[in-house]
Curated annotation (Swiss-Prot):
Keyword Chloroplast applies: no
Protein name stated in the entry: Small ribosomal subunit protein uS10
GO CC terms, sorted: ribonucleoprotein complex; ribosome
Family that this chain belongs to: Belongs to the universal ribosomal protein uS10 family.
Highest taxon, organism lineage: Bacteria
Xref: Gene3D superfamilies: Ribosomal protein S10 domain
Keyword Ribosomal protein on entry: yes
Keywords: Ribonucleoprotein, Ribosomal protein
Role according to the record: Involved in the binding of tRNA to the ribosomes.
GO molecular function list: structural constituent of ribosome; tRNA binding
Subunit and interaction comment: Part of the 30S ribosomal subunit.
One of the protein's GO biological processes: translation
Length: 102
């Protein structure tokens, strides 16, 4: 697979879980003999939701909730067939969203 690049984007709400998953991917691929760039931390997406505390009145009393989406980017340059096979078998947590582009 000379001249190819695999780009992996990880998304999660928990920054500790995404860092552990990224470390697992990097360790697995480097053991298989491919070169890795990353994990590169991408900007954290922050969604803020404003909710009125009371169901009927007291509009001035509001509560804010936020949801942060942490993202990481990993590039695998010139992946070996062994590296691709080990990536397919890798077991990662369910709360990490993985996008793979060739």
């Amino acid at each position: 697979m000379a001249g190819q690049k695999i780009r992996i984007r990880l998304k999660s709400y928990d920054h500790e879980v995404i860092d552990v998953s990224a470390r697992k991917i990097v360790d697995t691929v480097t053991r298989a003999g491919a070169t890795v760039v990353g994990p590169v931390p991408l900007p954290t997406e922050k969604n803020v939701y404003c909710v009125i505390r009371s169901p009927h009145k007291y509009k001035d009393s509001r509560e804010h909730f936020e949801m942060r989406t942490h993202k990481r980017l990993i590039d695998i340059i010139d992946p070996t067939p062994k590296a691709v096979d080990s990536l397919m078998r890798l077991d990662l947590p369910a709360d990490v969203n993985i996008e793979i582009k060739l």
